[in-house]
């Protein structure tokens, strides 16, 4: 790479010693304006046709956008026709304003008014580039010449609006604002304010775009605070943001600029737009939501929003995209899985409304996602993640020591295969290894008990098992079925067996519900678990003992 200090110049800082934005927070939603159908559309490899535009437009209305930039009707017949469709057939609610973009050229302004005939409170968004670079390289004009372009357009637009009977709203953008000296931007914007003469009933939207993101977010915030302090007729001016994401900090720049006094944000769903994209209004809205602020955009069905986005834009959303990506509610790390598992249990026990789960800044259900994919299992996964999946998807609550034991089995499989294991595969492995054991030597068939003669409190357990398919009858003594069956099996197998831990729970509700029992069996070589599932809890317990005994036999045979 070439010497950066020679080729590039650092962006100058803004001198505001008494800046106030660092101590502020965002406590209310801004006015939102979607520019998906204009800025987003013009950035697509294949611009939207009518059907794709119409579907996106309907989604934006359903989400609650009150201002929607529908295109650049003077630039193409397609955009003009779509504007007419929105006006005539778009079923636009009375509280929604259609916005269109136009350059400061008389013939384009005339065509724009034609496109909006009959619209309710439409916004005419006019702009011209004001940056030092474009004044010098593109237009060859001085500040006065650039200001005159904006002033002339403002006069023509306000005159045409008055002749059309009023009802129009106005927005002006000094395009490439972040590349414009603040004093120059202020001079041009104040000249437009003087022409438009905004009132409390019809405020001027003054859009200050980060057309190209050129500096750190704090500098954009300083620029916005400076403009808010110095613009004329501030009480009747809506300060609007239009950030891009060239440096990857569009979200942060927008949030700091809102803290600096901005009232409005223009952006796109999931950040589609020129180059690296416009600011992502969905992420902005959900960031506010997770801070306890109503974003006033409906993101409850984020999968549907994603589906329309991908259909209309013919683009896919990355797996790690905030709030919507396939993997954003997923943990592979064992320690993360364990923390999520414990957090989910704690929040159920606490039964209070505040969301507090490690590694999940938002409840996935709030955006229409499920808990099913929160934890996924690969070679980095721990016992907590495996336990969570079995509990959440199949109602199996593994004892802690069994979590450790089964995790080693799953770890071996993921290490060998090098892939993620889906929940169904994990469940099937658990059932095969601990419950059905298709290749096991011993199978439980049935049992009954009867008193042990003169021994008070002791019963004889008579059980039927199969040993490699051959029916065997065994007997043992104990204080109950489990104790007696352990005694019978120990004698039959010639192995000293004892129960170190036992637990059970139901798998479903109702009179025909199955139960699962877990037995940690202690034997001369250590401890191993078994599990049994049956509609009869005693039978489930005896099956769990057989399961553990089979695993002891496997261990001894190695």
Swiss-Prot record:
Give the Enzyme Commission number.
2.3.3.13
A GO molecular function assigned to this protein is: acetyl-CoA C-acetyltransferase activity
Q: Which cofactor does it need?
A: Mg(2+)
One Gene Ontology term of the biological-process aspect is: L-leucine biosynthetic process
- Where are the residues of the annotated region Regulatory domain? 437-558
Q: What is this protein's function? A: Catalyzes the condensation of the acetyl group of acetyl-CoA with 3-methyl-2-oxobutanoate (2-ketoisovalerate) to form 3-carboxy-3-hydroxy-4-methylpentanoate (2-isopropylmalate).
Describe its partners and assembly state.
Homodimer.
Q: What is this protein called?
A: 2-isopropylmalate synthase
Species per Swiss-Prot/TrEMBL record: Agrobacterium fabrum (strain C58 / ATCC 33970)
């Amino acid at each position: 790479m070439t010497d950066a200090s020679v080729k590039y110049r650092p962006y100058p800082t803004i001198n505001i010693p008494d800046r106030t934005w660092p101590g502020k927070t965002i406590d209310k939603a801004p006015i939102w304006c979607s520019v998906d159908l204009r800025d987003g559309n013009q950035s697509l490899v294949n611009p939207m046709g009518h059907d794709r535009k119409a579907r996106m437009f309907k989604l934006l209305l359903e989400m609650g956008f009150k201002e929607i930039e529908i295109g650049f009707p003077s630039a193409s017949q397609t955009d003009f026709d779509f504007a007419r469709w929105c006006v005539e057939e778009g079923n636009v609610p009375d509280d929604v304003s259609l916005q269109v973009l136009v350059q400061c050229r008389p013939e384009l302004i005339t065509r724009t008014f034609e496109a909006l005939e009959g619209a309710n409170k439409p916004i005419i968004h006019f702009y011209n580039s004001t940056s030092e670079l474009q004044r010098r390289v593109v237009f060859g004009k001085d500040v006065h010449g650039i200001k005159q372009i904006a002033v002339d357009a403002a006069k023509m637009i306000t005159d045409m609006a008055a002749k059309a009977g009023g009802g129009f709203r106005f927005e002006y953008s000094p395009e490439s604002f972040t590349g414009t000296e603040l004093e120059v931007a202020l001079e041009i914007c104040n000249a437009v304010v003087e022409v438009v003469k905004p009132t409390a009933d019809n405020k001027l939207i003054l859009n200050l775009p980060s057309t190209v993101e050129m500096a750190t977010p704090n500098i954009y915030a300083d620029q916005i605070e400076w403009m808010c302090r110095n613009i004329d007729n501030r009480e009747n001016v809506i300060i609007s943001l239009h950030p891009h994401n060239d440096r990857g900090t569009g979200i942060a720049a927008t949030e700091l600029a809102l803290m600096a006094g901005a009232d409005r944000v223009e952006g796109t769903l999931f950040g589609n737009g020129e180059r690296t994209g416009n600011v992502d209004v969905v992420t902005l809205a959900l960031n506010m939501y997770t801070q306890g602020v109503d974003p006033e955009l409906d993101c409850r069905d984020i999968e549907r929003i994603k589906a329309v986005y991908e259909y209309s834009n013919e683009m896919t959303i990355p797996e790690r995209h905030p709030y919507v990506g396939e993997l954003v509610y997923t943990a592979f790390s064992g320690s993360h899985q364990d923390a999520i598992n414990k957090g989910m249990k704690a929040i159920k026990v606490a039964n209070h409304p505040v969301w507090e789960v490690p590694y999940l800044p938002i409840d996935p259900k709030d955006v229409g996602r499920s808990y099913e994919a929160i934890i996924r299992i690969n070679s980095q996964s721990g016992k907590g993640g495996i336990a969570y999946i079995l509990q959440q998807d199949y109602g199996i609550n593994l004892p802690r020591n069994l979590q450790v034991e089964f995790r080693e089995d799953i770890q071996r499989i993921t290490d060998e295969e090098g892939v993620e294991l889906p929940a169904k595969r994990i469940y099937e492995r658990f059932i095969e290894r601990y419950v059905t054991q298709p290749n096991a030597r011993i199978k439980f068939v049935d049992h009954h008990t009867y008193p042990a003669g003169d021994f008070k409190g002791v019963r004889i357990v008579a059980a039927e098992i199969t040993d490699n398919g051959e029916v065997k009858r065994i007997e043992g003594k104990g204080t109950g079925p489990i104790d007696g069956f352990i005694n019978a099996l120990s004698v039959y197998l010639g192995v000293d067996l004892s129960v170190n831990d036992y637990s059970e729970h139901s798998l479903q509700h109702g009179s025909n519900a199955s139960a699962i029992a877990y037995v940690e069996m202690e034997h001369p070589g250590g401890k191993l678990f078994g599990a049994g599932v049956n509609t009869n809890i005693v039978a489930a317990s005896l099956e769990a003992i057989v399961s553990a005994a089979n695993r002891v036999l496997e261990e001894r045979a190695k």
